[in-house]
Amino acid sequence: MAKTATEKLRQNKATKKVVLDKDFAGIKAGQRMLVGTPQMMDAYIRKIPFGETRTMQRLRNELARRNKCDATCPVSTAIFVRISAEAAIEAMELGADIADVTPFWRIVGPDDKIAAKLNIDSEWIRQQRALEI
């Protein structure tokens, strides 16, 4: 049986720092790339203050800088942000209060590609953002 997003989020994974031997996703060969974890993305999102939003680009830049890297892997970042968002949605479906889940709508915009993949209407994301203005 496939793991739930909550199970994926709880898996202990180590961050990796990789020096690229060839260009990858806009990151140049020779640059140091951070490959984060679902927990790292979740922790970052939880720290975004009420009423504020962030872009994926800002998330990647800040995490790279904090970890002394040139860039953060955009592919794994998108996957791990999605895991964090899906775990929050699962928790709400099980009755968790919105105040107790990771506020993924602060990083995932209603028109983002990730939003289209989530099991929640993008209008809901739009409404959550509007409630925090």
Predicted regions span which residues?
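Nucleic acid-binding interface residues in structured DNA/RNA-binding domains
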Residues: 2-5, 13-133
